[in-house]
């Protein structure tokens, strides 16, 4: 025995491999329990957030239904769902107003409504034109192709105003992939037009038609444009748009905002 090493240090305790395993298991259990608590908290937070979002969406549906009972419930639900989807993706989070167009209604009838969600008021209930190549009184041909002179559907985000060939107009960004992404390139804008004449529509059997723009009466063009400009939404319902109410299926893209 090498005495230079001195007597064993009794203050230094050793543990067996088995005891080390037990201690490690205990620490693992504590860590696992902590992870479970953290995960459960995150799940609960996400669940609460989802519940609040659903509640807000339901509130808007109920509000619009009361303010504009002429709009079919399914169309309202579709429009609000598409709007909320865009907002969850960071577009129009401060939007206060939503316009809904139902292109399954004849052009001779009022088929465009503008609702102020914050003030809880119906601002407009009006006629709106569809593209000349989309159909006679009700659009049956829909296109997002440049030069098609057809109406495009889906969710639009309003931008700035300008004065062009049709007077005071409002730029629109198409947010619905496969439906209206070419809106900026097609120069699809909101403007007033003399051919949007409800009285003439009675004798003609249809309202005057546009080159694809959601044109309105000249008399109400400016106030309606001012009500919607700068970060609000317009939703155009028609054939096939029900799919746009499903957020998360990549039916909506924000890429067109860079156009």
Segments from the language model and where they lie:
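Polar low-complexity intrinsically disordered regions enriched in Ser/Thr and small residues
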Residues: 9-12, 31, 52, 157, ...
């Amino acid at each position: 025995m090498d005495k230079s090493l001195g007597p064993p240090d009794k203050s230094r305790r050793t543990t067996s491999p088995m005891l080390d395993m037990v201690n490690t298991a205990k620490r693992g259990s504590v860590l696992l329990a902590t992870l479970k608590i953290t995960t459960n908290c995150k799940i609960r937070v996400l669940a609460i957030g989802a519940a609040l979002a659903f509640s807000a969406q339901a509130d808007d549906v109920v509000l619009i239904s009361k303010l504009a009972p002429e709009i079919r419930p399914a169309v309202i639900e579709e429009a609000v769902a598409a709007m909320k989807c865009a907002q969850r993706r960071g577009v129009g989070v401060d939007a206060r107003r939503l316009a809904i167009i139902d292109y399954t209604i004849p052009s001779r009838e009022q088929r465009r409504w503008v609702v102020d969600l914050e003030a809880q008021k119906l601002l407009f209930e009006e006629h709106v034109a569809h593209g000349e190549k989309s159909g006679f009184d009700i659009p049956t041909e829909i296109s997002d192709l440049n030069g098609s002179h057809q109406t495009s559907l889906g969710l639009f985000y309003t931008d700035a105003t300008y004065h062009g060939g049709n007077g005071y107009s409002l730029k629109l960004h198409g947010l619905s992939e496969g439906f209206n992404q070419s809106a900026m390139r097609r120069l699809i804008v909101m403007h007033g037009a003399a051919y949007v004449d409800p009285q003439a529509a009675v004798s003609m059997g249809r309202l005057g038609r546009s080159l694809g723009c959601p044109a309105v009466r000249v008399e109400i063009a400016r106030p309606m444009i001012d009500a919607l400009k700068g970060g609000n939404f317009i939703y155009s319902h028609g054939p096939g748009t029900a799919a746009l109410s499903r957020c998360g299926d990549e039916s909506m893209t924000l890429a067109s905002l860079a156009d």
